[in-house]
Amino acid sequence: MMDMQVRKVRKPPACTQCRKRKIGCDRAKPICGNCVKYNKPDCFYPDGPGKMVAVPSASGMSTHGNGQGSNHFSQGNGVNQKNVMIQTQYPIMQTSIEAFNFSFNPSVDTAMQWTKAASYQNNNTNNNTAPRQNSSTVSSNVHGNTIVRSDSPDVPSMDQIREYNTRLQLVNAQSFDYTDNPYSFNVGINQDSAVFDLMTSPFTQEEVLIKEIDFLKNKLLDLQSLQLKSLKEKSNLNADNTTANKINKTGENSKKGKVDGKRAGFDHQTSRTSQSSQKYFTALTITDVQSLVQVKPLKDTPNYLFTKNFIIFRDHYLFKFYNILHDICHINQFKVSPPNNKNHQQYMEVCKVNFPPKAIIIETLNSESLNNLNIEEFLPIFDKTLLLEFVHNSFPNGDTCPSFSTVDLPLSQLTKLGELTVLLLLLNDSMTLFNKQAINNHVSALMNNLRLIRSQITLINLEYYDQETIKFIAITKFYESLYMHDDHKSSLDEDLSCLLSFQIKDFKLFHFLKKMYYSRHSLLGQSSFMVPAAENLSPIPASIDTNDIPLIANDLKLLETQAKLINILQGVPFYLPVNLTKIESLLETLTMGVSNTVDLYFHDNEVRKEWKDTLNFINTIVYTNFFLFVQNESSLSMAVQHSSNNNKTSNSERCAKDLMKIISNMHIFYSITFNFIFPIKSIKSFSSGNNRFHSNGKEFLFANHFIEILQNFIAITFAIFQRCEVILYDEFYKNLSNEEINVQLLLIHDKILEILKKIEIIVSFLRDEMNSNGSFKSIKGFNKVLNLIKYMLRFSKKKQNFARNSDNNNVTDYSQSAKNKNVLLKFPVSELNRIYLKFKEISDFLMEREVVQRSIIIDKDLESDNLGITTANFNDFYDAFYN
């Protein structure tokens, strides 16, 4: 006999339900046979925590199981593809579900409806989970991966938070390739969240972290709004208890020898202190959670204070206006056409940069157009001599178009080719914007060159960067701020990374990097949180002549003041009491500085001013004053019930001052723009037949800033316009005021309408004078402004009908507007007359009445019931109001 060593084979662990019942498990996933038999939906197989999941291949991801085929994930066209490995912190939840058990409705583009016979959830974590779902229908977002849903509308469960797909693949909404597999949208459900997050991505760990920080900031705002709601409820409860105690303890106070009058005085002081603690800065937050849903697909921008979207969610009238727009689009079922990315895909396939012939480049660099442009004035780190020397030495002779492989080139040549590319694009933009003389046959190739060179440089380790590389990054970020061509502008701060990583001894380069970083963020109202505001701009040595570098030297003190103001606004704890004195003090300093600067340069015949800074300051002043206006207006409505007439008068006066500051700074903006950037003299001479625009070639530097700020000011002007217009159709507001106030409001209403029509004429003229080449981003921006004004005027014409016929009366019916929210009705007649005269001053400056009558734009769809929105023009409408 032979002794045979027998080894007992350990069976794999069963599911949790079979372990409990101590019965055999067939290990069928996602639900084993026993659990199906006993109708146990919480069947799952726990895996060890911290398990690293295998990374799928770059070509796609295949899954095999019951009824599962292969799913392919589109990886995009990025050059730098790196795997972002993320280890799971929780046991991996098995969420493999048969694709054939789901139904997909392609007509719904914002959400997908998934149906299954029985839902299940993972109860293996130690965190608090949501109640068990027994419904047969599970709703999930198109980018969602969670099966567990919380019954609470305010607080998500821990499983929900764990299953939020915050990785860049979901946040950036990478395109899926629907041509390979009609069920490719199941890629996030057929695997667990960790597998999906570990897919090959063309992005770096730093980019992923930045996106996740933005996500967490939004979650923080949600938590803060919940805290605000809780604090308000507690304060109301405490106020009720205080009133009850005062009534119940009157006898007790008398026994203690307290006189009623003295006691009443003490109670009044306590009440006043309690009210002062309720002075939240609500103009910067959204107190109504439902507002985020009511104006879809508009997205809130809590990290960008100076944008249209930010004020639309926080102003009562703009918010209702967008609700009506949403109703119109929802009723008519308009759809946005998909973008065409064929050219971008074609360029990214070849890693070669192509340039015009050497002779053309040298002729361009020595041309009179480049000398007249005086590029060193706004780009002080540019050196034309070194660039010409590089072209002579590196480019082959002949009439052929040279090409270079970005993979084989050293870093020094890459950066020089990048600087040359940006210079040619700058010169092309300056020539083609109005003069129509540019040779734009190579523009697409140059844009492709810039993308490829930047992508190749990002693959190089930061420690190998030299000063020329940093200079190229700075020049590229400057060109990016002009936003002429690039639809996919980078939001990363590569220039700031260079500032923090290197000790840059070149003064011009050092301050140019800081100036560009700050200007880029301040235009949108972003705080420079990565570098303290006090350290953003260092003093200029006395040995350097500031007149030689106007782009860097101008308004350093005002830049520091603006940085402090934006940082305070970004850091306002709106759920706690806030003192507005510091905000108003910085705002006053910035306003006085801009006023002095404008007066100085308006009297200077040789204007060498970098006007982008001043436009940026004015944008900050107008937005901050509008926040204060909305804040004081909301405080006034609360004061009707809880405060004395003195407080109401005080808030009304503050609103009047804020509104006058808004209008005055808008006037300064139009004066600067149409005197120095786009001279309006030719527009005023329409009546004489002289309709030529006199360009100096530098308008392209300011086109993007002008368009962005103009759109903001149009939205704010329309908010004031609606406050005046409300008396035309709402009897409630009309009865709140007397006849004299109503007359003044109608005068302001007509004058704002006149201003909007004049701006429409001017912008239309500027657009027509530009090159008809649609590739210019600034021209598209001018079209957005025209569409904004056009649909606003149509809405004003038909607003009364919209107020009566709205389907959702609780949301969009203007006849049910919140009471006492229109502070203009509380202004004295003298103050309203001052506002009217200020608007009249702007209107008279823009254009004469005779010119308006000759150049008026006739809108055939002015009386249209749905604002003239059709399938053909819906893309333009959507781009103007929602992008």
UniProtKB/Swiss-Prot annotation:
Q: Where is the composition biased (Basic and acidic residues)?
A: 252-270
- Compositional bias (Polar residues) spans? 130-149, 241-251
Q: Name one GO cellular component term.
A: nucleus
Any one GO MF term held by the record is: zinc ion binding
One of the GO biological process terms: nucleosome disassembly
- Note whether Secreted occurs among the keywords: no
Q: Which UniProt keywords apply?
A: Chromatin regulator, DNA-binding, Metal-binding, Nucleus, Phosphoprotein, Transcription, Transcription regulation, Zinc
Which positions bear Phosphoserine?
A: 150
- Oligomeric form and interacting partners: Forms a heteromer with RSC3. Interacts with NPL6. Component of the two forms of the RSC complex composed of at least either RSC1 or RSC2, and ARP7, ARP9, LDB7, NPL6, RSC3, RSC30, RSC4, RSC58, RSC6, RSC8, RSC9, SFH1, STH1, HTL1 and probably RTT102. The complexes interact with histone and histone variant components of centromeric chromatin. Component of a fungal-specific module (HTL1-LDB7-NPL6-RSC3-RSC30) within the RSC complex.
Enumerate the PANTHER family for this protein.
Answer: CHROMATIN STRUCTURE-REMODELING COMPLEX PROTEIN RSC3-RELATED, OLEATE-ACTIVATED TRANSCRIPTION FACTOR 1-RELATED
Protein name listed in UniProt:
Chromatin structure-remodeling complex protein RSC30
Organism of origin: Saccharomyces cerevisiae (strain ATCC 204508 / S288c)
